[in-house]
Structures are given as C-alpha cells and as structure tokens.
Amino acid sequence: MYSMATGTVKWFNNAKGFGFICPEGEDGDIFAHYSTIQMDGYRTLKAGQQVSYQVEQGPKGYHASCVVPIEGQSAK
C-alpha cells in the first residue's frame, strides 16, 4: 500500500487532460493525468488547489495516481 502525499496543483490543462502538482516539502513537480483524478463528473484540477495523491515511478519520471482534491481547505 502506498502512502498518500499532499501538494498543490501548479497548473492543469483541461484541453490536454494533464498538469503538474507541486509536492508539499519536496523539490520537483509530479505529472498528473485526468484519468487518475478521483471525483464524480468532469475530472479536472485548478491551479492552487490542494490535493492528496500517490506517487508512482513511470517511464518518464514520477507521476501521480489516485489524485483526490482536498475539500474545504479555507472555508472562511
């Protein structure tokens, strides 16, 4: 079982279906594909959004799997 990491969405391109996450307390960016986003309806992320995810090693570097948006970060 992988542990979940947290980070902030750097950018996400809806037309291309991918973007990058800045991991919390780590250097480098993590690739995120729309197919790994765990949510109902249209799967998308927004820049600045907090997410939790699992990190996997892929052929082109690290990528996020099982991306879950963190709700209610600053509900004030």
Swiss-Prot record:
GO terms for cellular component: cytosol. PANTHER family: COLD SHOCK DOMAIN PROTEIN 2 (PTHR46565), COLD SHOCK PROTEIN 2-LIKE (PTHR46565:SF5). One of its GO terms (biological process) is regulation of DNA-templated transcription. Pfam families: CSD. The lineage of its organism: Bacteria, Pseudomonadati, Pseudomonadota, Gammaproteobacteria, Vibrionales. The keyword Transcription regulation applies. This is Cold shock-like protein CspD. GO terms for molecular function: DNA binding; nucleic acid binding. Keywords: Activator, Cytoplasm, DNA-binding, Transcription, Transcription regulation. SUPFAM superfamilies: Nucleic acid-binding proteins. Residues 7-67 form the CSD domain. It comes from Vibrio cholerae serotype O1 (strain ATCC 39315 / El Tor Inaba N16961). CDD domains: CSP_CDS. Signal peptide: none annotated. It is found in: Cytoplasm.
